[in-house]
Amino acid sequence: MSEFWLCFNCCIAEQPQPKRRRRIDRSMIGEPTNFVHTAHVGSGDLFSGMNSVSSIQNQMQSKGGYEGNISSNVQMQLVDTKAG
């Protein structure tokens, strides 16, 4: 028994090729503009308690650049997800 292949190009729509994302290298990235370093904040700082968060907010506000912002009170519930 033999195989017989027949192509119907008129019935098959060509699938568009997915667009390839342009690869970015370091030479394409410029220096930051209007960058002001105000504080270092790590995950440990946020989990050490609300007093620490308030302290960080006060430190950042003392550096300036927050004059146009509206302040608000935020309440968060921390949930410990450590595996037991």
Swiss-Prot record:
Disulfide bonds: none annotated. CDD domains: CRIB. InterPro entries: CRIB_dom, CRIB_dom_sf, SPEC. Gene3D superfamilies: CRIB domain. Residues 29-42 form the CRIB domain. Keywords: Cell membrane, Cell shape, Cytoplasm, Cytoskeleton, Lipoprotein, Membrane, Palmitate. A lipid is attached at C10, C11 (S-palmitoyl cysteine). The keyword DNA-binding does not apply. GO terms for molecular function: small GTPase binding. GO terms for cellular component: cytoplasm; cytoskeleton; plasma membrane. PROSITE patterns: CRIB. It is found in: Cytoplasm, Cytoskeleton; Cell membrane. It is a lipid-anchor. One of its GO terms (biological process) is regulation of Rho protein signal transduction. It comes from the Eukaryota. Belongs to the CDC42SE/SPEC family. Probably involved in the organization of the actin cytoskeleton by acting downstream of CDC42, inducing actin filament assembly. This is CDC42 small effector protein 2-A. It comes from Xenopus laevis (African clawed frog).
